[in-house]
């Protein structure tokens, strides 16, 4: 059996890929919201009740959660001796820490990185994998809507691909949001938009899509930008680009939370499909 922690929008869709080809996929309902329970039911996941029960019954655990929770998730199953797949947006350095937690107690580790939207149709989403057992995980998804690919020979190659990809997609989204806000504060936004229409005709539309995506999910991207910054620093590259991107996304409130930081750019609107990965 396969354990899935947890069935958020991405996790539930990944779980559905597994159940659609006959795998039993366990999840833990304890402490989870009604929305999560509904997603798990729609994906035909089997409720084991607690994370401990998932770890006791599953031979493989797939972790799909926000990057700030990746290490905590590994601690939650500390002592698990099966195959642990971390498919979160974390730096190679964090991935090595998670791998150490798992392998220190006899488990095996596969690194993963998901690029694209939740896999509900073929060709939309890739799961990059690396590590000695990567091909075993790849085989689980054969024939499903999730395209799995081996990223490289190093243990954390998959995380490196995810960091490099997100550095562009979400990093440039943060940059264009900052540019729009700068122009607005200086009173030249309409002039800038007119110039974009002449020389960069796709930028206004992109900035609107980036703002809408950030309004919905920007708070989740703060930790990812910090992980990318750490990846850059570890490679002796400037990390300031993505530290700044983290600060931009930090200004977007968790939806429904009134006491969150002000989002100066959220007036631009919403497009949950931009950016992806």
Language-model segment annotations:
Residues 53-108:
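Rossmann-fold NAD(P) dinucleotide-binding segment
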Residues 4, 70, 90-170:
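Rossmann-fold dinucleotide-binding core
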Residues 23, 45, 107, 146, ...:
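Short phosphate-binding/catalytic loops that engage adenosine nucleotides
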Residues 160-259:
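Helical "substrate-binding/catalytic lid" subdomain
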Residues 22, 57-58, 81, 124-125, ...:
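Short, well-ordered alpha-helix to beta-strand connector turns
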